[in-house]
C-alpha cells in the first residue's frame, strides 16, 4: 500500500505522453541531455585552469614607530578643559 508498482509507472508514462505528445517529450529529454552534457563540460574545464598566483606578502611592521603609551601626563593632556576646570 502506498508503493508505486510497475503498472502505476506505466499509467504515469501514458498520461505524460498524452499531455506532452511524443515529439515534445523527446525534445525535452534531448534538451535535458544537452544541459547535462554542457554542465559536465563546464565542470571539467574548471579543473584545468592554472592555480592562482600566491598573494603578496603582508608588509612588515618593524620599521613603523610605536604609538605613545598612556601615561598620566598623556591622559591629562587629553582631558577636555571643562572637566579640568570643575576639579
Swiss-Prot record:
Protein name: Sec-independent protein translocase protein TatA
Entry's transmembrane regions: 1-21
CC annotations in GO: TAT protein transport complex
Quaternary structure (record): The Tat system comprises two distinct complexes: a TatABC complex, containing multiple copies of TatA, TatB and TatC subunits, and a separate TatA complex, containing only TatA subunits. Substrates initially bind to the TatABC complex, which probably triggers association of the separate TatA complex to form the active translocon.
Keyword rRNA processing assigned: no
Predominant cellular place of this UniProt entry's protein: membrane
Record localization: Cell inner membrane
Record bears the keyword Transcription regulation: no
